[in-house]
């Protein structure tokens, strides 16, 4: 089984309680934290790296990660910074909208030296998102981590995961996201995100997929809500159906999909070293197997409110 290091923000999702929208419950979340927990709950060896506060919420988050089986030894505690929070609203279909409180919070203060302290020989997969690209210092650190992982022959997984409200200047967004492509083996985007980035470059959806591959991306996974998932590489391109479900909360569905794909991809113990794991992305059968597993994970997650509690265990996916 491959070992995952997921990097980025771990924060508090303030989820609505009842129908008034006035009462909210603090729930652990953050896209890369969800991926780390999802991977661990399926049975994988999972680490999480990022900045975390010493405040009440920070302690709660660290305990929550550890309780789900995530190794938290790569966390950097930032004593004088607060924990980021996000106010989550859900519509009738379970789709989300977000309002972030993330000014100088602990998750924004992870630096290059923190990556240097990690024993990369123990890591097979490095995962990150673009939510740590919004300000220059944390973007520089994030890109440094991706470069370091790539140099160490670690599979680099990048979920674009755009949250436009986090960006003070969205003109910087596409350039920063695209700088990461040269160090990315596996790229995950929603169809909406891909169309946004394609428009920024003045091209079509298909043009943008070709651009990503030309930058060195080995495999692109494009999700589209209840529609089919696209698996695209230089060698193949195909779509897989998504099961029809009644969605209660889609908060961590994409993260569950990523965790499931990475887990299934690296599941054969004693066989895959970092090099062959990257090469496995080029095999259509392997990709289809992992993507079908990932789709089940995402669908199950939509049927429960919250993030960590909604992420499935292996028995749920196999049943």
Q: At which residue positions do the language-model features occur?
A:
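Residues at secondary-structure transition points
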Residues: 23-30, 56, 171, 203, ...
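Positively charged, low-complexity intrinsically disordered leader regions
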Residues: 1-19
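Substrate-binding N-lobe of the ribokinase-like
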Residues: 20-95, 102-109, 319
């Amino acid at each position: 089984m491959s070992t995952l290091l997921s990097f980025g923000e771990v924060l508090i999702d303030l989820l609505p309680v009842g129908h008034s929208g006035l009462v909210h419950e603090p729930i652990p979340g953050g896209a890369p934290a969800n991926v780390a927990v999802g991977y661990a709950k399926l049975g994988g060896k999972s680490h999480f790296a990022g900045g975390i506060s010493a405040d009440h919420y920070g302690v709660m988050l660290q305990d929550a990660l550890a309780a789900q089986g995530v190794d938290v030894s790569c966390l950097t505690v930032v004593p004088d910074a607060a924990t980021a929070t996000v106010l989550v609203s859900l519509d009738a279909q379970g789709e989300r909208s977000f309002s972030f409180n993330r000014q100088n919070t602990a998750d924004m203060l992870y630096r290059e030296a923190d990556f240097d302290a990690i024993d990369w020989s123990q890591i097979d997969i490095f995962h990150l998102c673009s939510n740590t690209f919004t300000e220059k210092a944390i973007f520089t650190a994030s890109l440094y981590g991706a470069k370091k992982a790539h140099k160490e022959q670690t599979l680099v997984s990048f979920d674009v995961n755009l949250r436009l409200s986090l960006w003070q200047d969205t003109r910087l967004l596409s350039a920063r996201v695209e700088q990461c492509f040269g160090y990315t083996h596996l790229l995950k985007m929603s169809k909406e995100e891909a169309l946004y980035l394609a428009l920024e470059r003045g091209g079509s959806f298909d043009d943008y997929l070709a651009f990503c591959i030309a930058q060195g991306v080995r495999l692109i996974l494009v999700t589209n809500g209840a529609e089919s998932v696209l698996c695209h590489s230089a060698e193949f391109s195909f779509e897989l159906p998504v099961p029809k479900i009644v969605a209660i909360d889609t908060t961590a569905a994409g993260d569950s999909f990523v965790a499931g794909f990475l887990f299934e991809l690296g599941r054969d113990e004693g066989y895959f070293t970092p090099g062959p794991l990257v090469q496995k992305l080029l095999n259509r059968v392997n990709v289809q197997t992992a993507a079908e597993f990932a789709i089940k994970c995402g669908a199950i997650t939509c049927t429960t409110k919250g993030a960590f509690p909604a992420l499935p265990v292996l028995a749920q996916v196999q049943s």
